[in-house]
Amino acid sequence: MSSEKMPIETLQADEHRFAIILGAGAAGIIQGCTFIREKTLPLEEFQILERQSAFGGVWWKNTYPGAACDIPSHEYQISFALNPYWSRTFAPQPEIQKYFEDVALQYELHKSTTFNTEIVEAKWDDSRLLWLVETTDLTTGDTKLWSCHVLIGALGAFTVPKKAPVKNVDAFKGEEWHSVDWPKNANLKGKTVAVIGTGPSACQFIPNIYPEVKSLIVYQRSPGHVLPRNDVVVGSLTKWMFAHIPFLMRFNRWFWMKKDEILRPRLFTVGSWLQKIVISMTRNHLYKQIKDDTLRRKLESKDVFGCKRPLMLSDYYPIFNNDNVELVTDSVTELTENGIKSRNTDTGEEMERETDVLIWGTGYNPVDFGLPVPTKGRSGQLLCDKYQPELFSLYGVAVDDFPNYFNFLGPNSSSFETSVMELFELQAHHNSIATEYLFQKNVGTFRYAIMPKEERVRSWTLSLRPGQAKLPPANPNCKSYYRSKIGHVYRYPYPYWQYKALIAKLDFKRDWVLLQQRIGQKEVKVLEF
């Protein structure tokens, strides 16, 4: 089948499921498990479509040296699938990927998952009140058209890698890659290596590649706040106790999450007593590991705490004490065939440094919500364009003009206060409630869909703006992916119990409209609840 000659809405689907989940990472796995646990849908009624060849999402894809969780393992796990056997306080990438894969297999999600599948386009078909999803099999090149009532975007925020906006970005002739595409056969032994970017991923792999390289050049735009990692091996006695006395494991997780719930709002309040203490800790950590005053000035963050994601690393700073490591704080301006040009912002002097290997540690584009899958709503507008530039959404899970569409980690839903795993579980439950309603409603001679009210989407988002303006990333000097393209902070700013209460149930009368269509007819009625 080929959809190149005609619009996909004119074609008949090859496969139909009631719900399709895009992505088999943590969010997609939690959504599938929630469907099963809450008896929303049986396995045969939903399908997970995944580009990679295994479960795990970013934890399958990111295999760079030193890849690990920067959140303690006992917090970075699913509440209904606690793992008593974490090896360390901060588990490494292979262990985390296996954990998510094991959870997926436990709930038999492999029976409803199609791997090696590129989503070409997802489009709402108003003539049938269905989503149409075109895919390509990456192993055979075959295309397929799926249809579904409910479409759930579980692709996460860290799927679209970015590079620095520099001149002649494709000019470099040496070896080059982004941290997310780390080659399995990468050989850095005896080579000069340049790293552009000092975000969370770069700060993890830099200490791990240093022993191999001849020399290392690190280009830093602005330093972040760094705290000691305090990563320790979990003892066999602790593992035994967690495995055989599950209450202790649950209490341990509850204790640390409750601590975060109490302390994090204060930590991310600008000028708070706790923030001042933690900033002092970051300075002491830097001064203990770096003795050179010039290096200290380069590595000490000038940002308000919380502008960027704080880092927890104990092996990062010492790398810069070595003679064969150069920290460059000039602005990268251009790539050449043999290296990188940068300009000193004070003197205007430009300098080229040659390198054998260039590694991009510049992270992702989390603010480009709706990417990388082209997803079109009722009007034909792309989801990524619908969100921009104001980032309006309903609770970060839905948006007007996109019926029966739900996603994870959308605008204005993440918070400094809580773990992303808890957020995924909250949003999966919300999506499950909506799906159950639609599953029960779509029987008989009518089809139904639900869609957020435009005025509610706007009013809820705008109600967050006063609180968001007080968050650390709102500082005018802060350059952060926590801000939209026009400067709005898109994190939830208020006590998180309020968000939990909002998303725990669906208020159909306040938030939603009902689309109704008699099967076989094209007229769609928009009804109030």
UniProtKB/Swiss-Prot annotation:
<comment type="function">
    <text>FAD-binding monooxygenase; part of the gene cluster A that mediates the biosynthesis of botcinic acid and its botcinin derivatives, acetate-derived polyketides that contribute to virulence when combined with the sesquiterpene botrydial. Botcinic acid and its derivatives have been shown to induce chlorosis and necrosis during host plant infection, but also have antifungal activities. Two polyketide synthases, BOA6 and BOA9, are involved in the biosynthesis of botcinins.</text>
</comment>
<dbReference type="InterPro" id="IPR036188">
    <property type="entry name" value="FAD/NAD-bd_sf"/>
</dbReference>
<dbReference type="GO" id="GO:0004499">
    <property type="term" value="F:N,N-dimethylaniline monooxygenase activity"/>
</dbReference>
<dbReference type="Pfam" id="PF00743">
    <property type="entry name" value="FMO-like"/>
</dbReference>
<feature type="binding site">
    <location>
        <begin position="68"/>
        <end position="70"/>
    </location>
    <ligand>
        <name>NADP(+)</name>
    </ligand>
</feature>
<protein>
    <recommendedName>
        <fullName>FAD-binding monooxygenase BOA2</fullName>
        <ecNumber>1.14.13.-</ecNumber>
    </recommendedName>
</protein>
<keyword id="KW-0503">Monooxygenase</keyword>
<dbReference type="GO" id="GO:0050661">
    <property type="term" value="F:NADP binding"/>
</dbReference>
<feature type="binding site">
    <location>
        <begin position="70"/>
        <end position="71"/>
    </location>
    <ligand>
        <name>FAD</name>
    </ligand>
</feature>
<keyword id="KW-0285">Flavoprotein</keyword>
<keyword id="KW-0560">Oxidoreductase</keyword>
<dbReference type="InterPro" id="IPR051209">
    <property type="entry name" value="FAD-bind_Monooxygenase_sf"/>
</dbReference>
<comment type="pathway">
    <text>Polyketide biosynthesis.</text>
</comment>
<dbReference type="InterPro" id="IPR020946">
    <property type="entry name" value="Flavin_mOase-like"/>
</dbReference>
<feature type="binding site">
    <location>
        <begin position="198"/>
        <end position="204"/>
    </location>
    <ligand>
        <name>NADP(+)</name>
    </ligand>
</feature>
<feature type="binding site">
    <location>
        <begin position="58"/>
        <end position="61"/>
    </location>
    <ligand>
        <name>FAD</name>
    </ligand>
</feature>
<feature type="binding site">
    <location>
        <begin position="221"/>
        <end position="222"/>
    </location>
    <ligand>
        <name>NADP(+)</name>
    </ligand>
</feature>
<keyword id="KW-0521">NADP</keyword>
<keyword id="KW-0274">FAD</keyword>
<comment type="similarity">
    <text>Belongs to the FAD-binding monooxygenase family.</text>
</comment>
<feature type="binding site">
    <location>
        <position position="76"/>
    </location>
    <ligand>
        <name>FAD</name>
    </ligand>
</feature>
<dbReference type="GO" id="GO:0050660">
    <property type="term" value="F:flavin adenine dinucleotide binding"/>
</dbReference>
<keyword id="KW-0843">Virulence</keyword>
